[in-house]
Amino acid sequence: MAIIKPFKGIRPPQDLVEQVASRPYDVLNSEEARVEAEGNEKSLYHIIKPEIDFPIGTDEHDERVYAKAAENFQLFQDKGWLVQDDKENYYIYAQTMNGKTQYGLVVGAYVPDYMNGVIKKHKLTRRDKEEDRMKHVRVNNANIEPVFFAYPDNDKLDAIIKKYTAEKPVYDFIAPGDGFGHTFWIVDREEDIALITEEFAKMPALYIADGHHRSAAAALVGAEKAKQNPNHRGDEEYNYFMAVCFPANQLTIIDYNRVVKDLNGLTPGQFLDALGKNFIVEEKGTDIYKPSGLHNFSLYLDSKWYSLTAKAGTYNDNDPIGVLDVTISSNLILDEILGIKDLRSDKRIDFVGGIRGLGELKKRVDSGEMKVALALYPVSMKQLMDIADTGNIMPPKTTWFEPKLRSGLVIHKLD
């Protein structure tokens, strides 16, 4: 069972939300944040990317930078740019992209559920990234940014969400840059709060979609605080961390593609011949070719597109990891032919989120920066959940979720 609770969110006043809200900390670098926050003292970047308040080149992991985050968080509250709600609520956060809307419930997720596997992971985390986020949670004593969860589809929750979203929202705006819509409601009726809590309690699992490092950091700080408190009861606010939970059937994972600098000493002809061992290779011409389904790949090389279809026997349908197209392409193309053993560390490979389109792959190859591009059919939510349920970990750079959660719509304090 998944334990959740409502919380007293800290939020911007309605007329300030567009100035406060920002992209998540990990989708842009310090210089990009500096540009986006220019002339806007109310931008959340002053809290989640506080190095922008220091001279260019300041180490973002400097202790003074973390301290600045806490100072700015307090300043935002003192100035009334962030205000805490009087009572504990759940919240509904809707995101609209390309005419499609997904509706998430903003809740306090339970730290022990993360520790005991009710909250399921599909990705490995790096200790240095965990420690960075842990410091941020500690100094602010808050989850400034939410994590992104999926839950099994639930008709009763759908009905509650439908009821509230028929009413006037608290926030409703289009984000600059990407043009995605962000809409927000407060779930404040006690009977609805109770029903949401009950429905989550019936769920065997919740799934981290995006935000593995934030989840790990929030849970580790919560456990740390429990250990440090001699009067720990288990119901304190630090036992919970902020998550936006979406029904799995509303979520779309988009493709996460690869570009490689060279052919590992092979000529284009030799490379295509080598591919023929494990794939049916078909030339598709100069028009962009998109993978048509699982086990079909799109290759761009020397101004031409190719279809690659994995031959029978090159993958195992009964292996939840082995059947993934990222595994097939990593093993049979990147490793076996191109000599790329470690996707995380090899400098010859880069990754391009599908949000940029296959035209971005063509552009990077045509520019001469890269030699070859490989586009993959996206992973399904069912595959992600099956892998998490079996305790497996997806290969690196497998999932790309879009739209990203906007930060700054609501914050969860740990006391």
Regions found by a protein language model. Give the residues of each.
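Surface-exposed, charge/polar-rich loops and edge strands
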Residues: 1-415
